[in-house]
Design a protein with these regions (language model features):
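Conserved binding/recognition cores within well-folded domains
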Residues: 1-93
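C-terminal output/interaction extensions
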Residues: 100-112
Length: 112
């Protein structure tokens, strides 16, 4: 992780290090020991833990499920047990994460 005026997330996939602007990241999804950083045009897969990623990216992201960490600015709306991203993708929201997710989305809307 790396912070500058233009905040970015640095991840390593194999021998390659990628600098991904925070504003381009839609969400992170974990599957076992692998985490995928998903942008509009690409997925970057690396080994890690979602809890570690959450600590590194900070308050712009909220945990919506055991496997998903979403950038609040990428969310269009919350419907039932899902969030709908601005590009139409739907991600599950666990019942235990709904209150904190709703609060984070509301805060992002008020501050944005």
């Amino acid at each position: 992780p790396y912070t500058t005026l233009f905040r970015s997330y640095i991840c390593r996939s194999g021998d390659t290090h990628y600098r991904i602007p925070i504003a381009n990241i839609l969400y992170f999804v974990s599957d076992r020991r692998q985490v995928a950083c998903v942008t509009a045009g690409r997925e970057y897969t690396f080994y890690g833990k979602l809890d570690t990623v959450a600590a590194e990216v900070g308050a712009d992201f909220v945990r919506i499920h055991q496997r998903y960490l979403v950038r609040t600015g990428a969310v269009d709306r919350m419907e039932g047990g899902e969030v709908v991203l601005r590009d139409g993708r739907r991600l599950p929201v666990s019942r235990s994460c709904q209150p904190s997710a709703l609060l984070a989305f509301t805060r992002a809307e008020l501050e944005g």
